[in-house]
Amino acid sequence: MSPVTTESPATVPYVEHIGMTRQYWRDIILGINDGLVSMLLLVAGVVGGGLDADQVLLTGVAGAIAGAVSMAAGEYLATKSQDEVLTAELDLERTHIIHYRELEVAQIREMLTAMGVRADELEVVANALTRDDEILLNAMKALEFGVVDSERRSPYKAMVMSGLLFLGGSLSSVLPFVFVDDTTIGLLWAGGITAIGLFGVGMVKAVVTRSNHFVSGSENLLIAGLGGVVAWWVGKMIGVGLT
């Protein structure tokens, strides 16, 4: 009788997590996309208004700086406010654990059951998570509020990323007017570079999300581009109404 052989299943290659940047990808995508789209619309508007290349360049530089500062300040305040709300909620949760411990223990049992912990395992798991107030607080922080300390966003990092990436995105619409005197040619260059930039941002996102590069790039280009077209059209309609 020949020996029975078993083939081991194909090994899935181990892929590292992206690390501490993952909670800031919102700021990365928003900052650079906003810089790409909003600055192109600004440049298109002033070119349509008849400004020469030097005036367009000056307007673009001023708009890029103002937009970056506004984006950075807004993101700092928004992130800090969200973190303050969360801190206040966790302080209240600590008070609940001290004064209404039985209710919190019952709540964590309900959450464990909802997660699929079997009845015969529930007592062991619940006792492990409730044997100490600090352990219970950490468990409630993760299960009730969905918070892990390592994933909390720094307002300063969010501010810097949003502001700098907005500034970086705006360069695609500003730099062409450093090298050309014809505003129409400059605008065409700005539009082309912006489109490439939007597609590139989507492709970079696909590397992180491990999704299809072309689909992600096209999605970012189409959605951001459509938003830009809508904004331009609304502005044009308002302008027609005023004249």
What are these regions (language model features)?
Residues 219-232:
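Small-residue-rich segments of transmembrane alpha-helices in multi-pass membrane proteins
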Residues 2-78:
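Internal alpha-helical transmembrane segments
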Residues 35-40, 162-173:
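Core segments of transmembrane alpha-helices
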Residues 172, 192-211:
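Transmembrane alpha-helical segments of integral membrane proteins
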Residues 2-20, 24-26, 80-163:
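Cytosol/matrix-facing amphipathic helices and coiled-coil assembly/linker segments
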Residues 77-91, 204-218:
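Juxtamembrane helix-loop transition segments at the membrane interface in multi-pass membrane proteins
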